[in-house]
């Protein structure tokens, strides 16, 4: 979604919800794995105070399937794919619904493991040469012009993407008017290099000098209590959300171009 930012810190103007749990973050939003999902609601903006901050441009609400009373269910979904230009891929998930107390209590468990095989090759190359010799002028360039090669990180299919996680939910039908849902979700994402390539180097090829990665790890817990009060509907949502994000992107050639054109030594008196 769109963001408003100052420097490197961005605040989203569109909100993302997983059931009643707000998972909107600064900058890029978490990518929820679409397993055992009932529906997705796209609510046009601007939204009011029901969804709070970050809803000026709208709200995306992902609704999961809830535990079903008196139903025993097992769902397996497995797929395998191959590619002529890269590594193979797979996608597997399992859904289990377990009734615990008749008409009162049920649990639902979801687990998934998926991998998208890479198809971008990091081929051998050297850094660009620049006539301005900005390394001597600037003094902070990490390598000499035209001398650094990427022999240590040359590899095929560097842009693979892996995701694993699980979701556990417990639903209690307290009576005809009251219900409670307790949910916990964990998801880990481990991606390699970015999927762009340089057509001047070759088809699906690029020259990168550092190992790239993008990793996320998030945990979510929520307790939602709903009630029919007769004169109104009550929805109480209490949640905890924690996300760790780390990434590394190679900008060696960009740094060299920047240094050459913007770091100029002016002659003094």
Language model features: what each stretch is:
Residues 179-218:
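Flexible loop and strand-edge segments within Gram-negative outer membrane beta-barrel domains
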Residues 90, 158-175, 183-185, 210-249, ...:
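Outer-membrane beta-barrel transmembrane strands
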Residues 84-191, 219-221:
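Transmembrane beta-barrel wall of Gram-negative outer-membrane proteins
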Residues 1, 30, 42, 55-79, ...:
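N-terminal periplasmic accessory domains that precede
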Residues 43, 75-79, 108-112, 183-185, ...:
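Transmembrane beta-strands of outer-membrane beta-barrel proteins
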């Amino acid at each position: 979604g769109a963001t408003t930012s100052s420097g490197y810190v961005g605040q989203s103007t569109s909100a993302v919800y997983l059931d009643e749990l707000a998972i909107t973050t600064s900058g890029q939003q978490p990518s929820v794995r679409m397993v055992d999902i009932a529906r997705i609601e796209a609510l046009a903006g601007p939204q009011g105070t029901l969804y709070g901050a970050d809803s000026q441009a709208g709200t995306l609400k992902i609704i999961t399937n809830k535990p079903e009373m008196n139903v025993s269910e097992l769902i397996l979904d497995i797929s395998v794919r191959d590619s002529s230009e890269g590594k193979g891929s797979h996608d597997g998930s399992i859904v289990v619904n377990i009734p615990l107390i008749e008409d009162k209590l049920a649990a639902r468990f979801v687990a998934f493991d998926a991998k998208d095989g890479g198809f971008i090759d990091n081929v051998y190359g050297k850094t660009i040469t620049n006539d301005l010799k900005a390394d001597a002028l600037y003094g902070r360039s990490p390598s000499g012009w035209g001398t650094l090669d990427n022999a240590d990180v040359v590899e095929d299919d560097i842009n693979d993407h892996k995701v694993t996680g699980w979701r556990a939910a417990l639903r209690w039908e307290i009576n005809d008017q009251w219900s409670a849902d307790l949910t916990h979700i964990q998801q880990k994402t481990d991606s390699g290099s970015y999927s762009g390539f340089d057509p001047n180097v070759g088809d699906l090829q690029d020259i990168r000098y550092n190992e790239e990665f993008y990793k996320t790890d998030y945990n979510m817990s929520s307790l939602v209590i709903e009630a029919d009060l007769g004169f109104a509907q009550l929805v109480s949502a209490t949640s905890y959300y924690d996300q760790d994000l780390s990434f590394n992107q190679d900008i060696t050639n960009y740094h060299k171009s920047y240094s050459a054109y913007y770091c100029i030594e002016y002659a003094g008196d």
